[in-house]
């Protein structure tokens, strides 16, 4: 059900009524010791965003799409989120439980303007991983790949994601594909033609390196392949293709530094990045220290305020416990200057995703 502009303004205004009071309570506790960066104290109410934002990267319970969407709709007001996007986990053909956008699209269509779906993680991504394994990226494979991508677009996905180039074992298996693989180059062309983005999960690996300490091989590869140069070739292949590099702030190699992000953003105008903070797994090069944005990250977000979006990797329904990913990210978001919040919160999303999303955000007041 499409939300009318009048209803959207009312909803956003209503969601903001409690922000000042709740934020005041948060600031009251800000000077007290906390067990995690930016984490609200146990027992306090959730702290919503100071201004509306789009939660661009979330996942869901594929066995209960209706419950997932109900949970997300309930979260909109609690978070002061204008929209929530669901992405498919990047997967392989031999992994039980693989799925794609078709499991969620019928439910999501009922709530256009509130939730939206990216697709391809369970099929396009699996086709790329299979192609890497077989070495076959010939005309027949490319034809089948393009047909599937265009089928997803006809069904109503607003982008391709979550795709993977270097992904550790977890909910889905370990995955590696060169970001300049022929099927990724083809996907960039398809994305550019249809005006939709690609959302890519890729650990930063400037040169071949051993698997970082703390991770096991198997199931992960013992050595990680260099991928930054190949990633730049993907970005340069079709400058009209908007590429979102997922999870800035959740570094699994030690190389996704603000300096690397800055260099790539300067070099490639079609590159965008999601900000992710996880209170339970900081990883390396975390953007927060004692709840405060580190200066080097604040400078990056400010200097490239037109290139970042919010993507917490939150799961819906929310896991039990107070440490929600969206909350940690909102506490970071609330520290940004108001003009930067406006861009990162909604304006960049409207530009990246185009009119199909921008029309729903036009009435949002930042």
Question: What name fits each language-model region?
Answer:
Residues 176-310, 360, 364:
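Catalytic pocket-lining loop regions of alpha/beta-barrel enzymes
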Residues 60-68, 90-100, 125-127, 136-141, ...:
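Acidic-and-aromatic substrate-binding clefts and catalytic sites of carbohydrate-active enzymes
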Residues 76, 108-112, 153, 235-236, ...:
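N-terminal cationic-hydrophobic initiation segments that often serve targeting/anchoring roles
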Residues 38-41, 68-72, 97-106, 143-148, ...:
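Alpha-helical scaffolding within the catalytic cores
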């Amino acid at each position: 059900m499409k939300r009318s502009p009048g209803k959207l303004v009312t909803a956003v205004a209503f969601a903001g009524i409690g922000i000042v009071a709740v934020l005041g309570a948060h600031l009251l506790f800000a000077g007290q010791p906390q067990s995690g960066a930016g984490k609200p104290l146990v027992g306090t109410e959730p702290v919503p965003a100071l201004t509306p934002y789009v939660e661009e990267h979330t996942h869901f319970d594929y066995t209960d799409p209706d419950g997932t969407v109900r949970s997300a709709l309930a979260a909109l007001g609690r978070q002061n989120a204008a929209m929530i996007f669901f992405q498919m986990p990047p997967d392989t053909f031999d992994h039980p439980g693989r799925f794609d956008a078709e499991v969620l699209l019928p439910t999501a269509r009922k709530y256009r303007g509130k939730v939206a779906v990216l697709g391809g993680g369970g099929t396009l991504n699996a086709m790329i991983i299979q192609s890497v394994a077989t070495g076959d990226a010939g005309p027949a494979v490319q034809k089948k790949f393009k047909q599937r991508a265009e089928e997803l677009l006809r069904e109503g996905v607003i982008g391709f994601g979550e795709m993977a180039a270097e992904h550790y074992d977890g909910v889905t298996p370990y995955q590696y594909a060169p970001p300049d693989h022929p099927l990724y180059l083809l996907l960039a062309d398809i994305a550019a033609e249809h005006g939709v983005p690609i959302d890519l999960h890729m650990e930063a690996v400037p040169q071949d390196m051993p698997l970082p300490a703390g991770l096991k091989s198997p199931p992960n590869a013992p050595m990680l392949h260099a991928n930054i140069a190949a990633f730049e070739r993907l970005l340069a292949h079709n400058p009209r293709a908007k590429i979102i590099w997922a999870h800035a702030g959740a570094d699994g190699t030690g190389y996704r530094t603000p300096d690397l992000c800055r260099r790539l953003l300067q070099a490639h105008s079609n590159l965008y990045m999601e900000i992710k903070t996880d209170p339970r797994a900081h990883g390396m090069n975390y953007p927060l220290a004692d709840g405060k944005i580190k200066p080097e990250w604040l400078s990056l977000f400010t200097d490239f305020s037109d290139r970042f979006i919010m993507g917490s990797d939150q799961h819906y329904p929310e896991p039990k416990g107070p440490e929600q990913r969206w909350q940690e990210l909102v506490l970071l978001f609330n520290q940004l200057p108001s003009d930067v919040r406006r861009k990162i919160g909604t304006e960049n999303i409207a530009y990246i995703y185009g009119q199909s999303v921008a029309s729903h955000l036009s009435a949002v007041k930042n």
